[in-house]
Amino acid sequence: MTSPKGKPSPKRSAPAPATAALTPCAEERTEGATSSASASASSHISSSFDSPRDDTVVLTGYTAESEHSAHGYERLHDIILQGSDTDADSEDGRANEDDVILFPHAEELSNAAAGVGGDDDNGRVVRLGTTQHLDESDSSEDEPTLNRVGDIPLEWYKDEDHIGYDIEGKKLMKKERSALERLLEATDDPNAMRTIYDALHDEKKTLSNADLQLIFNLQRNRTTNPNYDMYSEVQEDTVVFDPLNHPLARSGGPSKKAFVPALHDMKVIAKMVRRLRKEEAERRLRPAKEEKEEEDQLLWDDSHVEMDTHTHFKYFNRIPKPKLPPPGTFESYRPPPEYLPSERAKQRQARLRTIDRKEHFLPQSFDALRHVPFYHHTIQDRYQRCLDLAFFPRAQRTRLVVDPDKLLPELPDPKDLRPYPEKLSFHYKGHTATVRSVSVSPNGQYLATGCDDHLVRVFEVQTGRLMKRYDMGAPVQQVEFCPSTSLNILAVAVEYSLVFIVPTFAAHTLVNDHTIRFLRAPGLSAGQREAAHALGAVDTLGGRAVTQTALDADETAHEATADLHDIEEREKRAEFVDASAKERNAGIVVKIAMHAKVKKFCFHIKGDYLCALCPKDHVKYRQTIMLQLSKRKVFCPFRKFSEVVTDCRFHPREPIFFLATTNSVRCYNLMAHRLQRRFKASGGVTTCLSIHPEGDNFLVGDTTSHTSWFDMDFSDKPYKRMRSHKGVVNALAFHPKTNAYPLFATGASDGQVHVFHGMVYDDYNKNALVVPVKILKHQRPVYAVAWHPTLAWLFTSTEDGVVTAWTE
């Protein structure tokens, strides 16, 4: 017999007639009546319920896709009930309410299978749902299996053109049908709703009504025979119970309350249960104690000796005595010849005192060890050894092993912090001496350099072309472009003067005219300026002749300090001098004469104010001079200032002035005219100063190779102190656009320029991030560094006159 899914069923004994009537038989393929009955059933399966055959039940609305689901069988059951309503009403009441008859003539067929019918039906099996009558021996179990591949997965043949082999070893070829053919076949076939696919034989089989009834009963745990009574053999109890004659009934019986546990007992039991659970939980938490086997005690075991705490600690924490070093070649009885002392060495050893001798013997050579005499200092050496052990305490120190890499902070990879200058792109040649200063124009198109060969050179950044050269007549200390884009000013510090140049090629004509009007003296006509300049009679472009006159007058005034009429001369701070005709042709507009050599100066961000430093001025308050160019005003803000100044800077956003001295940085409020804060610069003498464009942080370089990062919101002491150079830090600078390029660079006398990534966060909970990213190397000491205003380019100058541009 074949299962509904097409798999061969195991062999079993011949069933009884009643059971055989309910076995699925749609798979049987026999000759004669079987073929004709199946053909006739298939031809009329699609007919309606108006004119059904007497021995055939027509099922509609059942699909093959739902043959394996409970929902499909429930739907099939409903269809069968609907089809049997009319016939059930016409019956004469033979069916009881307890009988399970799902379609017409089922009871009649089952009776025929059980032998209840007429004489003609004896000895024959009637299959439900058909009119086919077969012999009892004709069963699906006797039908041979065509495919003899055995009990193996049929998926093994899914890629083959056959499904197995028959009994003669011939291939059983697959019936190739496309999806369209299967769809049309399922549409045209009236038995498609009860047709299943036999994968073993690659054919379709139609389920009969009996097969469907059998599946329906098995799914609901019912017997296959609807007439089977499972309680037919149960014997009824014939004993009659008389409650009046029962012994418990006579006395009323025990009370039900006697069988209910007492409430007090329940509480006691619950308490005992809780105690047991608690002990069990504690037992699980306690570590399991390993049962130690009994061992023989050691007779001389010191661990079981009773002693006080101090003795116990000293005994078990004793430190072994240091061992004597093994004898060396010097103490050998046959040392190499170079170890044997000469006569002069023997005499020198004899002249030394005993306490001054390193060794109490001199090396000697013996032919054999038995020839070595007794060592006379044995007792002294042993005694000295005992003194060392007794009077020199031994201490045990725990050695702290720390990985040096773990002490370093976790910093991002420098490759992730690009762009930053890392390759040499331009050389600006022509300098014959030390270049002490470089400056880039506000638009980033021109580069100005100040050299000790008395020349100021202006180069075009992109091409390296020399645009203009100015002869100052003296070594140039510093050059700087005005940071304001509305003014085209190049300021130069030359010994005792500040020279203001208007490079006409660097800006538009309107900007140049506005700059010249800005620098001219207010209230003076052009003729008055010519007369004032003719009085000076200066022909050189430098400031030596102009400033020397002021210097001589100042020194003469200080020599006659007793004269009251020299007070006004001593109080003179600086003097504005208009340029001569020759100087104006060269681009020089005005010069400012100082009393001492100008070391450094800086512009305000708006370009109107300027501060100059003259640290060698013998008048202390004149070491720091502030100038207002538009009104030609000169004033010294620090009247009682005695420290030596090194650098100065204006705050980029607020009226705050930073002044660096030898050991500190002072922060002044220019509006309140008072000292706001003082930052202690630990280390050597400060050399340079740079302010962050945001104004809350600044850098200080000193002579001890340190670069200190100060955070004004953090403390008066350095937030970070970096020693990356091996020489004096001569220059440092922040990038003007730190929002786009958070970079700063330091240059030192060791010939190196270190580029750092310095990110300042707006969140006060985050500290500034400082990461070294690149080292740019030169052959000679670096004196100046300057950033491009819009790009991550760095310009440097060295002692040998090399000016370079490093690009990203």
UniProtKB/Swiss-Prot annotation:
<dbReference type="GO" id="GO:0043021">
    <property type="term" value="F:ribonucleoprotein complex binding"/>
</dbReference>
<keyword id="KW-0698">rRNA processing</keyword>
<dbReference type="InterPro" id="IPR028598">
    <property type="entry name" value="BOP1/Erb1"/>
</dbReference>
<dbReference type="GO" id="GO:0070545">
    <property type="term" value="C:PeBoW complex"/>
</dbReference>
<dbReference type="InterPro" id="IPR036322">
    <property type="entry name" value="WD40_repeat_dom_sf"/>
</dbReference>
<dbReference type="GO" id="GO:0030687">
    <property type="term" value="C:preribosome, large subunit precursor"/>
</dbReference>
<comment type="similarity">
    <text>Belongs to the WD repeat BOP1/ERB1 family.</text>
</comment>
<dbReference type="InterPro" id="IPR001680">
    <property type="entry name" value="WD40_rpt"/>
</dbReference>
<feature type="compositionally biased region" description="Low complexity">
    <location>
        <begin position="1"/>
        <end position="25"/>
    </location>
</feature>
<dbReference type="GO" id="GO:0000466">
    <property type="term" value="P:maturation of 5.8S rRNA from tricistronic rRNA transcript (SSU-rRNA, 5.8S rRNA, LSU-rRNA)"/>
</dbReference>
<feature type="repeat" description="WD 5">
    <location>
        <begin position="777"/>
        <end position="808"/>
    </location>
</feature>
<keyword id="KW-0690">Ribosome biogenesis</keyword>
<feature type="repeat" description="WD 4">
    <location>
        <begin position="724"/>
        <end position="766"/>
    </location>
</feature>
<dbReference type="GO" id="GO:0005654">
    <property type="term" value="C:nucleoplasm"/>
</dbReference>
<feature type="region of interest" description="Disordered">
    <location>
        <begin position="1"/>
        <end position="55"/>
    </location>
</feature>
<protein>
    <recommendedName>
        <fullName>Ribosome biogenesis protein BOP1 homolog</fullName>
    </recommendedName>
</protein>
<keyword id="KW-0853">WD repeat</keyword>
<feature type="repeat" description="WD 1">
    <location>
        <begin position="430"/>
        <end position="469"/>
    </location>
</feature>
<feature type="repeat" description="WD 2">
    <location>
        <begin position="640"/>
        <end position="680"/>
    </location>
</feature>
<dbReference type="InterPro" id="IPR015943">
    <property type="entry name" value="WD40/YVTN_repeat-like_dom_sf"/>
</dbReference>
<keyword id="KW-0539">Nucleus</keyword>
<dbReference type="Pfam" id="PF00400">
    <property type="entry name" value="WD40"/>
</dbReference>
<feature type="compositionally biased region" description="Low complexity">
    <location>
        <begin position="33"/>
        <end position="50"/>
    </location>
</feature>
<feature type="repeat" description="WD 3">
    <location>
        <begin position="682"/>
        <end position="720"/>
    </location>
</feature>
<dbReference type="GO" id="GO:0005730">
    <property type="term" value="C:nucleolus"/>
</dbReference>
<dbReference type="GO" id="GO:0000463">
    <property type="term" value="P:maturation of LSU-rRNA from tricistronic rRNA transcript (SSU-rRNA, 5.8S rRNA, LSU-rRNA)"/>
</dbReference>
<keyword id="KW-0677">Repeat</keyword>
<dbReference type="Pfam" id="PF08145">
    <property type="entry name" value="BOP1NT"/>
</dbReference>
<comment type="function">
    <text>Required for maturation of ribosomal RNAs and formation of the large ribosomal subunit.</text>
</comment>
<dbReference type="InterPro" id="IPR012953">
    <property type="entry name" value="BOP1_N_dom"/>
</dbReference>
